[in-house]
Amino acid sequence: MRQLLALILIVVLGGAGIYLLTPEGRQLIDRVRINMTRADYMARFRAGEPLPGTPDLEHIDARLAAAGVEMGVPVYVRIFKLEHELEIWVEKDGRFVRFATYPICLWSGRLGPKLQEGDRQAPEGFYTVDAEQLNPNSRMHRSFSLGFPNLYDQAHGRTGSFLMVHGGCASVGCYAVTDPAVDEIWRLVTGALDKGQPRFPVHAFPFRMTDANLRLRRGSHWDGFWAELKTGYDLFEQSHIPPVVSVCNGRYVFAPGTIATANSAVEARCPPEVTGNP
């Protein structure tokens, strides 16, 4: 009897292990990880505790000085859902350096893009933010709109509005980073805009787009879309300058960026090899 029970246990555990290697199993692992982080961060938020990894928000000027930059330099924002992180990069010596990483208290939905109004899904993709997209009087303390839907989203019939980065720890499709963190982010982005940066790029990813992370999720419904995102991610990783992002025939296309193009809006443009232009 004991041998039979042991055999049954081995079969059950083996079957579970095999399931976790499937795309559905990987999705389950990701959902468990996301929900555990959400529960932890929301409990800390309600208790008035800082979230793990929060920068020293009381000494931003000293941190800027230590980084060798001043308030008002151009900025670039990256968001990673799975890791619950928002990064601020600042321009220094002809490229961008990471200045701070802020924990995202809450984002809603699952890994994957936003599809339609009301799906409570946080966007993924390439966006830009100008001064008109900032709201200093938001119900969520301060906020800026990502500009969803962009041209890519529109080409795929995706709908939605008021998709923000904001304070607090509540979300119906936004990225909530707490009031103290959004105050610092606000100072950095408004400082850059006030000093002449026309807009700043915000690139939102499901996770850090490494080869290993993509392999783990091979077979996902979104692996083709994520492969497009990875191309833009890799260009930045190589140069630490945001790439030029365009939309061609419903797909993202990229070109290596320069400091002069780092603030470019996402436009509808096909490269010559696609259009046949000389």
Cite the ranges covered by each PLM segment.
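N-terminal pre-domains immediately preceding structured catalytic cores
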Residues: 2-172, 180-278
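A conserved hydrophobic position in a structured secondary element of the catalytic/binding core
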Residues: 177
